[in-house]
Amino acid sequence: MLIIPAIDIKEGKCVRLTRGDFAQKKIYLDNPADMAIIWRKQNAKMLHVVDLDAALTGEMVNFEKIREIVELLDIPIQVGGGIRSVEAVEKYLSIGVSRVVIGSAAVTNPSLVADLLKKYRPSQIVVGIDAEHGVPKIKGWTESSNMQDYELALEMKKLGVERIIYTDITRDGMLQGVGYETTKRFAEKAGMKITASGGVSTSDDLHKLRSLERFGVDSVIIGKALYECNFPCQELWYAYEQDLGIDGEFSTARKKECCR
């Protein structure tokens, strides 16, 4: 199972939210590119980058920050957040982004997804479904759609979408464990390749998700748990302090025994 570290960008900084609540924003580093370097040093094979400002406004506010990450790293970068036009997709792919994530637009403008899949490979265009109790949320999780999560997935499947990034937002940023049953239910009904997201906080969560590989769950996006050093043998503190020398939430005071 592929583990994909997440980088959320708000007002140019690397942040994490709790259940998508912008009022519960925690800044980890001022420069998201520095965070990307840390995850690459941790042997990340792909990064999931989200422009949170764009998710709210539809404007590519943090485009240059994302460009910097793409230019610095030698691994695929997946980008989401407020991508609602063919032009936005073209702009991201033109700078070397490997995969774009269509979220709200899959609900509000499904013809966009159809148009994109006529022009690009399915591996380049994926759909993100962020669900609360089975109902997709859109526009930065501020509005609900009028269908169930699996119904949206099946509609996207008809258009040629092959992969869904599925986020259980009741778990996102909570560090309270993955929504195993919710993800299992969705994966069984969708019958597609699934990247799981939301709530992963321990290695036990990863083992649970791995048991869903037979239903198409082959990868997982992890955010806050990595930032809080919840996994044994994370060496990001060493890489951070020795090579980057940046002050911030990542400090010696926050070291854990497993990270030494």
From Swiss-Prot:
One of its GO terms (biological process) is L-tryptophan biosynthetic process. It catalyses: 1-(5-phospho-beta-D-ribosyl)-5-[(5-phospho-beta-D-ribosylamino)methylideneamino]imidazole-4-carboxamide = 5-[(5-phospho-1-deoxy-D-ribulos-1-ylimino)methylamino]-1-(5-phospho-beta-D-ribosyl)imidazole-4-carboxamide. Its EC number is 5.3.1.16. This is 1-(5-phosphoribosyl)-5-[(5-phosphoribosylamino)methylideneamino] imidazole-4-carboxamide isomerase. Pathway: Amino-acid biosynthesis; L-histidine biosynthesis; L-histidine from 5-phospho-alpha-D-ribose 1-diphosphate: step 4/9. It is found in: Cytoplasm. GO terms for molecular function: 1-(5-phosphoribosyl)-5-[(5-phosphoribosylamino)methylideneamino]imidazole-4-carboxamide isomerase activity. It comes from Chlorobaculum parvum (strain DSM 263 / NCIMB 8327). Its main location: cytoplasm. Belongs to the HisA/HisF family. The active site is at D8, D130. Transmembrane segments: none annotated. The gene is hisA. GO terms for cellular component: cytoplasm. Keywords: Amino-acid biosynthesis, Cytoplasm, Histidine biosynthesis, Isomerase.
